[in-house]
A protein has these predicted regions:
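A residue-level marker of the well-folded mature domains of exported/periplasmic proteins
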Residues: 2-3, 23-405
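Secretory targeting and sorting signals
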Residues: 1-27
């Protein structure tokens, strides 16, 4: 029986949309009255993306104390069901083949740097001989070809796959599984349970719950929130908005959402236009790398800063500190980029690994802001505070120099 992994962290939608995806979004629910056909379509999309069972699951997982080393969140697990991997146990350094969706945004670039530093450690210890990587550049067709290339090459001891999209990538992932070599899927999911382990943080609904609850606690009924979203069709991002919108509606918060394409200029324009219509009390984002542009729109308009949720990207954290606004930095744990390699180490030793490896996902609060700014002092604005690579040999210079392998 197949277990659908697409609900939690995967990409869904047309490749043309995915080319724009940084790491964010879902179909909006509110749109101008003159765009009735679009509004109708988006309402249908919102209904499609909301899943009460998964919402409840992720709501509860936020309060679960993870199991595993306290100082190694990338090895921690939440409610793990373990899988026997004795069939894959063997000695000697292994060659891994990594089919990556892309490194097209700061979040993925930060993770890619961390992954390569972890790889060096495992190469030095004789666990991995090399990791051949192919970058699909946000293309389903390219990633399918990449996986098929690895299979035809016949030279992979194990596969790591960060899928570009869900349904389209499922057959290719299944073909990798059919080789009899271990497959680890991470970040985004597919519609098959053939992988030895599927690794991801708690998920999009958890993000939506954390962020909307924060705004609701700091606003009052009738206040207006502008939700800034990159594009439709990415399920983990769709779920961020679906979860947040549900709670906004229940609290009587007026939430209007806009797709931005991840463009800071467009973000600034959208917020400026909304401010021209009237007061805006809150800003909600499904990814924080355009947060500074949103804040600048308030500054340019001479308006009071909003209550705001961004992300753990340093550009937002620094602007949050500088302005003193009421903020929260949700996190889609970037340290997960280490976990697939460490999972493979366990698999080749024949050790148990979680079938679904759910990693912790906790926002950065105002009380923690100074701590994370200090810990990441000297890092570039595109760096993510909870990257989890402080114990790796290249720290901090490799991340400070933003060396993209």
């Amino acid at each position: 029986m197949k277990r659908s992994l697409s609900i939690t962290v995967s990409l869904v939608g047309a490749t043309s949309l995915l080319l724009l995806a940084g790491c964010t979004t879902d179909p909006s629910v509110e749109s101008p009255a003159e765009e009735t056909p679009v509004e109708s379509s988006e309402e249908a999309g919102a209904t499609e993306w909301f899943d009460q069972e998964l919402f409840d699951k992720q709501f509860d997982e936020r309060s679960v104390v993870p199991e595993g080393p306290e100082d190694k969140p990338y090895l921690q697990t939440i409610n793990a069901e373990m899988k026997d991997t004795a069939e894959f146990a063997s000695e000697g350094a292994k060659k891994l083949c990594f089919a990556n969706a892309s490194i097209s945004n700061p979040w993925r670039q930060t993770g890619w740097i961390t992954m390569n530093e972890q790889l060096k450690v495992l190469q030095d210890s004789g666990v991995i001989s090399e990791m051949e990587t192919r970058d699909a550049k946000d293309s389903d067709d390219t990633q399918i070809a990449d996986i098929d290339y690895f299979i035809a090459e016949g030279n992979c001891d194990g596969f790591i796959i960060s899928p570009n999209s869900t349904a389209a990538m499922t057959p290719a992932v299944e073909r990798a599984c059919d080789t009899g070599k271990p497959v680890v899927v991470f970040d985004r999911g597919v519609e098959t349970d053939c992988a030895v382990s599927f690794i991801h943080p708690i998920g999009g609904f958890a993000w939506g719950i954390d962020t909307s609850e924060f705004l609701i606690e700091n606003l009052k009924k009738g206040d207006k929130v502008v939700a800034l979203r990159i594009l439709p069709g990415v399920d983990v991002l769709e779920q961020r908005w679906a979860g947040a919108e549900k709670l906004f509606d229940e609290a009587g918060i007026e939430a209007v959402d806009h797709f931005t394409g991840g463009d800071p200029a467009e973000i600034k324009k959208i917020v400026s236009d909304e401010l021209a219509k009237g007061d805006v009390q809150g800003i909600w984002m499904d990814a924080g790398d355009g947060a500074v542009a949103a804040i600048e729109a308030f500054e340019d308009a001479g308006k009071a800063y909003p209550v705001m949720t961004g992300e753990d990207e340093l550009s937002f954290l620094r602007k949050w500190k500088d302005t003193g606004l009421t903020g929260l930095a949700p996190v889609y744990s970037n340290f997960q980029w280490r976990t697939p390699l460490l999972a493979m180490e366990k698999i080749f030793k024949g050790e148990e690994v979680p079938v679904e490896w759910v990693l912790p996902q906790s926002p950065i609060t105002a009380e923690e802001l100074d701590e994370y700014l200090e810990r990441n002092d000297g890092m570039p604005d595109g760096h993510y505070a909870k990257f989890g690579g402080e114990d790796l040999p290249g720290y901090p210079k490799v991340w400070q120099d933003r060396v993209i392998p």
